[in-house]
Amino acid sequence: MPSTFSQPSPSNALVNDRRDVFPLSPLIKITLVNLYLALTVPLPILAQLTQGNALLTLLLTVGLMGGLVALVAALAEQVVLNGEGIAVRYPRWVPKFFRSGWQLSWADVTALKCRTTGQGGLVYYFLTESKDRAYLLPMRVAGFNRLTQLVSDHTGIDTQDVRPLSQPWMYLLLLLFTFLLWGSQLAIVLLLWSSPPLA
């Protein structure tokens, strides 16, 4: 089994005490949260206007708020590197059954293997000598190039050809369409607000 982070000895304390933390890219967080809100905020309003059922509207609102909390929890992922190894962690408020994270010692890493996704992209996995499981290299963090450089420094694996799974322009385009969605919804609300009531 992969070993966990151990306490550094006095001789290598300066090396192992340094921690590099890589949170998820802010662009990805902003885009996905905005998209979720743009798609879900109108639903309770539409439910109230069409059904007029306060209980249904309340249940729908609570469910959508729970979905937002789950999304924020998933986006709270952090990658932590030090002289001992690499770890994927989440805040304490995130239940372990939802997102447990993992950690891996540099000494256990034997290779970085790429796999093709169903959409044609490439993802990379850390392999260990025990081969009991593979560990997905986080590819949506801020500072991804520095992350791969540190992985190369600690493991000796060439990471020059490793690229992020999604380029920033993809999320910028999605964010643009999200703002257009917000704008169209606002225009509809203003139109309904200014329209005279039906006789």
Curated annotation (Swiss-Prot):
GO cellular component, one term: plasma membrane
Compartments, record wording: Cell membrane
Key words, A-Z: Cell membrane, Membrane, Transmembrane, Transmembrane helix
Main location: membrane
Membrane topology: Multi-pass membrane protein
Regions crossing the membrane: 27-47, 55-75, 172-192
Protein name: Uncharacterized protein slr0269
Source organism of this protein record: Synechocystis sp. (strain ATCC 27184 / PCC 6803 / Kazusa)
Lineage, uppermost ranks: Bacteria, Bacillati, Cyanobacteriota, Cyanophyceae, Synechococcales
